[in-house]
Amino acid sequence: MQMKTKIKKTIIIILASFAIISIFLPSIKPLYNQTMNREFIENVESNALSANIKIVQLTYKTGVNSSSIAVSAGASGVIIRKEGNRYFALTANHVISVLEDVDKTQIVVLGYDDLDFKDSLNKGGEDIGIANYYMKFPEITVEYTSNKSDLALISFMSDKAYTVLSLAEDIPKYGDKIASMSNPHGKRNIVTAGKIGSKKFWDYEDESEKVKYSIIRHSAVTSEGSSGSALLNEDLDIVGIHLGGNENLFHQYVSGMAIPNDQVRAFLGEWIKTIS
């Protein structure tokens, strides 16, 4: 009887320990990554962050006796090219996908130094309404999209000077340090550090199970609003475009998913063919 009691206690202790680790480990790891990669993060903030953009959708819908305008929470993108006053940026295709049950969609871009509506109000800006506020920002032109890679190339006009980033020459490898710069969960210009967690590319099916993406995993913390953002290596070159993330049972971030730079390069090659 005593032996059975000891075994039960041991099992309970093991399960409790596992539960504690499951709860706290996902919270500790990002903090460790941020602390150990402070210099890398500061380099991104100083020399690359102005290439980060926020993409906001305004959707218009008209009913029998009413009309409405909805403003999205926003997503991310990264500037990769400039021609005159026109900037070209990469993002995820699902970020700019247009809803079918609306009458009109307008997609605008905020540069890294442009304020969100709530931040503008907090700094004493005039309350002209959220839709009117975002309408003053440049509207995007969709240059090229691909369902098979969930990538999109967009462009917008601006007189401001923003950083233009390049694609990395080498494919990211398991254990490589990377940094994400994005606009997660209502925040702006957040840089997080992590590592590539894939030893090889793996296939991911979209929710419709119609499209498979060959992606890489990474541990840089992201959230809603990070879709379309850039993953950078220590040379501040783009090694991937972030698509989404995975959570555990406690809704804590576990890992991110990104399209690697070789597929991004192939995507841009397809675009070049369409304009040549």
What is the predicted role of each segment?
Residues K82-S146, G244:
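Catalytic-histidine neighborhood of serine endopeptidases
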Residues M1-N65, V71-S72, I272-S276:
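N-terminal targeting leaders that route proteins to membranes or the secretory/organellar pathways
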Residues N52-V56, S76-I80, F88-A92, V108, ...:
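Soluble periplasmic/extracytoplasmic beta-strand elements of cell-envelope proteins
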Residues G129-F201, N233-E234, L243, S255:
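Serine endopeptidase catalytic core focused on the charge-relay Asp
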Residues E39-I41, T62-A92, V191-A193, G228, ...:
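A conserved glycine-rich beta-strand in the N-terminal activation segment of trypsin-fold
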Residues L49-A51, I55-G63, M157-T163, I190-I275:
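Active-site region of chymotrypsin-like
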Residues K82-Y87, G175, L231-D237:
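A glycine-centered beta-loop-beta connector
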Residues Y32-N33, F40-N43, K104-I128, I238-S276:
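C-terminal cap/linker of serine protease catalytic domains
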